[in-house]
Amino acid sequence: AYPTIRYAYNGMLHRGAYLPGDLFSAVDGMGEERSVLWCEMTDPHGNSCTIESQQGEVVFDVEGIYTVRVCATDEANRRSVCEFQIPVNR
């Protein structure tokens, strides 16, 4: 089975910087934890960026709904990409 990616929060996030591993988790078909490889984020104004998991934080700097696509792979290199709509407030 392909990895399952989960978003760790319910409700709104506050503006600020988060590590991808604090926001998202992934498990493979055997229930083993997998790393999130990258996130593609589009802010409420339509600006996009990609964040490599080992390289930086996901920054939510304006209020609104962000679209975040998250990628994870398992040991067999099967890839899952999930999209989340994340509301951000002050």
Feature-to-residue mapping (PLM):
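A structural signal for beta-strand boundary/capping segments at domain termini and interdomain linkers
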Residues: E33, S48, R79-V81
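Short strand-edge motifs at loop-to-beta-strand transitions and within beta-strands
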Residues: G56-V58
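Residue-level recognition of secondary-structure-to-loop junctions
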Residues: F60-V62
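Append "Rare intracellular matches occur via the same short Y/T/C beta-strand/loop motifs
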Residues: G64-E75
